[in-house]
């Protein structure tokens, strides 16, 4: 695998990836592992297909399987802090519009409450300094292939609403709670490595 990236930066960095057994999370886990990072994974359950796909079973320094939208998630806070995580990628989400339509409450819990738990851990963590959160291109009031970052945000159904609220939660943390030595980035993407690439 050929990767153009700053290997020196990533070497021995302690990185937590939520949704690490999903599509984006699994690819990022592989890439960061090849760059020399210590990769920690957090997902709500194991994805059998993912473990059949990878050849090296030692990609992860440690894996956690827990639903972030439940009270159980508070149990791993101390364990994550012990790991001295430096960088977090929050990809864990309910990512399907059709599922959100049929199960709106579960979608809200996963996408909003789950994100709150990660933001809260990040803000209280001594070691973590950088958090990147994935939302969606659906957060734009008028989604199109040509959206710009500063375009007006909005929502048209339950899925986009959950991601819109996720972005508002991030901004709220930035304004009211976030320590000055920490940074949060947002990624808004559509379908990745498939139709309608962004």
Annotate the PLM regions.
Residues 142-144, 195-198:
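Short beta-loop-alpha junction of Rossmann-like oxidoreductase domains
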